């Protein structure tokens, strides 16, 4: 049985305005939304890219707590989106290094996409290293996901078969916990934890200040009205 909460339809969404019962509830919402950029002051800049949109929520489970940007390529990324990505990395060029952690299927196209991302970003002038972390042959041997026949219609199939044989494997076949742990380990390896903790502490103080305002909202309003 699959839990209904595990099924996501990303193409059909109810849209509408947000509402609050009282003004102080807006402050509570702001406190929840108040986040500092955990990569401020870091020597490295990191993004996580995944081949398939179907896996973007699983990737997000790792990236959101790490405050790390993540992106669904949906196959070969469009030229316009690749240009936009290059501009992001160029904007981060003051840092020591920029990295993309890339996850994709182990098939002719999935393997080639890592190369494609690297080369097209370089073409647009971005100095970034694309690190493929999944799916790899070591992971296939470790977790033994079910194989599929390599697509003979793929123009990259010949080179793939010469190197890996006539079987391919999908990233989806890995347990979500394996994917999230893999991303967490890769991202934190590029992060200075001392700098990260300093930003977290500053963020916590900001949230505490907002909570104090929220709790004393009526008194704050009364004071402001008395000053009018």
What are these regions (language model features)?
Residues 107:
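Catalytic metal-binding/acid-base residues of hydrolase active sites
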Residues 1-98, 111-228:
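Nucleic-acid enzyme cleavage-core boundary/entry regions
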């Amino acid at each position: 049985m699959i839990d209904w909460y595990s099924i996501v339809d990303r193409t059909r969404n109810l849209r509408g305005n947000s509402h609050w019962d009282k003004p102080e509830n807006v402050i509570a919402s702001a406190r929840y939304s108040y986040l500092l950029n955990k990569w401020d002051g870091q020597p490295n800049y990191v993004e996580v890219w995944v081949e398939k949109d179907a896996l973007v929520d699983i990737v997000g489970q790792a990236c959101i707590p790490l405050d790390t940007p993540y992106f669904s390529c949906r196959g070969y990324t469009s030229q316009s989106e690749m240009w936009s990505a290059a501009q992001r990395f160029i904007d981060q060029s003051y840092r020591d290094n920029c990295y993309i952690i890339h996850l994709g299927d182990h098939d002719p196209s999935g393997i080639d996409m890592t190369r494609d991302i690297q080369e097209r970003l370089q073409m647009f002038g971005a100095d970034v290293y694309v690190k493929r972390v999944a799916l790899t042959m070591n992971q296939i041997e470790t977790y033994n996901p079910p194989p599929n026949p390599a697509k003979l219609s793929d123009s990259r199939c010949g080179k793939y078969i010469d190197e890996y044989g006539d079987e391919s494997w999908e990233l989806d076949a890995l347990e979500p916990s394996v994917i999230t742990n893999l991303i967490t380990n890769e991202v934190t390896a590029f992060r200075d934890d001392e700098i990260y903790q300093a930003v977290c502490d500053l963020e916590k103080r900001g949230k505490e200040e907002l909570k104090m305002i929220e709790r004393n909202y009526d008194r704050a309003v009364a004071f402001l009205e008395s000053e009018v």
